[in-house]
Structures are given as structure tokens and as C-alpha cells.
Amino acid sequence: MKKISRRSFLAAAGVSAAALALTACGGSGNSTAASSAAASTAPAGDAAAAASDPKVTLVYAEVNPLDTIVGQTGSHFKEKVEELTGGSVVIDVQASGVLGSENDVLDAILGGSTSIDISRISAFALTSYGCNKSKLLSIPFTFENRAHFWNFANSELAPEFLNEPQELGLPVRGIFYGEEGFRHFFTVKPVSGIADFKGLKLRVSNDPVMNGMVEGLGANPTVVSFGELYSALQTGVVDGAEQPIANYKSNAFPEVANNLILDGHTLGAVQAVITDNAWNKLTENQQAAVMEAAADTQAFNADLSETAENKVLDELKSSGCNVIDVPDKAPWQEACAKVISENTSDQAELYQQLLDMKA
């Protein structure tokens, strides 16, 4: 992956964040000139002024432990928000799923609950609530590599995806993108290739795209909540599942499913969303500081993800995990052809824009 300087990355992310902020405040999110101007003039003064504003505590939900890529990303966001607001906005990060599964949290905040203010979710999690653009980020083999994803996340197209919930009348808005590495399957029994997946019971989260992908591999999609996955693997309810490498290790899945096949079927794209109720608690100065922190966090995540993933993979290999490389992904892509076609045909032009952003 081509390395991007943090300064350049923040500049690009700032444009995306500014475009989002303009749209959230009623301005046009389509004006490049307006977005650039906002990025260059909004943050510094407003963020400094935020220190004298009324104190607000916002609860941030994270389903994974703090030592994962997404957990560290949440911690960084907390630090930056509190730094840029002089402590007038405090982020209370609740990790390891203590507030419930991703779906539990979304159901709560979209149902009007005010006990959770910000949630880190899978980038496609809002698909179940009508956000069809986000679904495209979960299509198998869309992103060739990390640089491909970050080309999208720092483009003028990204705010269009992040703003979709607002356009649909949902009481949340996206504030930044991130990723936790490519997702790979892991199994209880050894596998050597795609042929070994036939008949396996693979855990899914009841997402239509994931269901179709698993069926395309000849396996049986089996719905199990993330919190119950460890015991489901241990007791034979499922034969395998899929996660990014860091989450696989941090959640102790190698203890019960020690075979990791590096198929990289999708990139684990994530986003953070803030509720309208929480956003409206903030002054304009605090909102500007939160968006500056969001842009910085997006850059932090890009710096962290690949390095952290490679470190974890080395640790897994050293500890005896059976790591299986997949040098030829063509059979996997062919197996997913149907689910790709079925889930992109209604947004073919937009999906092609994503594909064309490859590095």
C-alpha cells in the first residue's frame, strides 16, 4: 500500500468532514469550493472557543475490546475530542459490547433511546434501516486493497454515503470512516481451500449480502449473535465464522477455531455515527471540534490498521494458529458472482464509481 503522509491525509479527510458538516447544517454537500473553504477556516478558532462551552458527556458504544483496531480508534477519538474542546465534551467509551450488540445499539438509538450517543458500526450496518448506498461497501471483493478503500473514504463521494441516514430521516449522522482490515473465514476443523466449505455451518449476522456470500461458497448461513459466537463455535452450533484478523485474536476465537484462511472477502469498513439528540446538545464550537477530531481519527485509523493487523498475524502464526494463504482468489470471486450482481444491479453506476477508485 502506498503510504500517505498524515498531513496530506488530514487535509483530504478534512474536506470530507467539512462537506458533511455543511450538509448537516443545511448547506450543500456537493460544492468542492465550499467544502475546502470550510476545512481551511472552521476548526482552529471554533475548537479553542469550545473549552468555555457547557460540559457534555457523550456515550460511545464499541462492540470490540479496546485493544482492537476499532477499540484503539475509539480511544483516539475520545482523546482528540476532549483535547480540542478543552474537556467541555467528554467521550465515555463503553467497549467489549457492554451496551449490547451492534444491532441492539442501532435499534436503541434509532428507536429514540438517549442512553447512547455515538456508535462505531460496520459501514453497512444501516442497510437494514434503508441505507442502500452503504450496502455497496459490504459487497465481496469490491476493494482490491486498503488504498482502494481510502481513495473512497477521502473522496467527495464519501459524504454522500455518510449523509444517507439524514436524507432518509433517520436520527443519526455519520462522522468518520475507518477500517479494521480485510475479513477472513476461520473454522473449527482444518480447511485447505474453497471446496472444504461445502456443507459447513458458518455464522452470519443475518445480513442478506453475507448470507448470499456464504451460500455461494456452498456453506449454510447460521445466524448467531456476536456475543454468543465463542460458545457457538465451542459447542458445534457453527463450524466457522469470519472476522478481521485483530478481532479474531482479541475475542479469543483461536481457542475454539484455530484455522484462519486468508481469503479477504471483504474489507472491514466501519463508520461512527452520532445521534441527532447528541449533536444538538453541542454548541457550534463543539460541533466543529468534534468534526475536526473525526477527521484526525480517520487519519489515525488509516495509519494504525495495516501495521496492527500485520503484528497480530505474526503473533497468531507464532502461537500455532493454522494460517492458510489464498494465492488465487478467482474461485472465491466466481462463487460470489451471484450475490455481487444481485446486490449492485440497482445501483450499478454508483458501484462502478467505487470500483473505479482502485489505487
Residue ranges and their predicted role:
Residues 148-159:
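A gly/proline- and charged-residue-enriched helix-loop-helix capping module
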